């Protein structure tokens, strides 16, 4: 597969992942699937917008760049047949790094939240974090420490786990594009587009 075609494939995969991450983050604002009375009762990590900013917005821009590489005009560099696509592929590596950082941000926030557990109403009628160092992950009986919102533990655990997996996949795809982009920069794409009058390798 040409480097441009590979980039398009990666971009096509990143777009739905980004939308999935945004949706998961939005759902975290409704713990247990319910509207909460006081926003202060939401887990702090929800407000870091890991899925909306990290896996979402910061990933959409690289994905669009990757999608555009398939039809990139090789004459885009002062009419030079060889450097147009090479420059575009090099630029894509920069966007891939940005995407990697965004996905990494979402991944870290999700991991911290999973380990910390959700903010909820505890037995002493105060709102806080009843779990420590992810102890609730191996002992479902501890979930009863959270009185309200109902089902907040499985809700947060599921959504942050989704964001964790999405972030990991996005980071992997961005690393692949960095390698793909460097190969495209050094070796060129499979062939030059017809506008230059050349059909051979870049």
Regions found by a protein language model. Name each.
Residues 3, 34, 77, 84, ...:
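Residue-level signal for well-ordered alpha-helical segments
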Residues 193-202:
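Non-transmembrane, juxtamembrane loop and terminal tail segments
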Residues 144-168:
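Individual transmembrane alpha-helix segments
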Residues 114-151:
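Extracellular/lumenal N-termini and interhelical loops of multi-pass eukaryotic membrane proteins
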Residues 2-123, 163-186, 191:
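Signature of small four-pass
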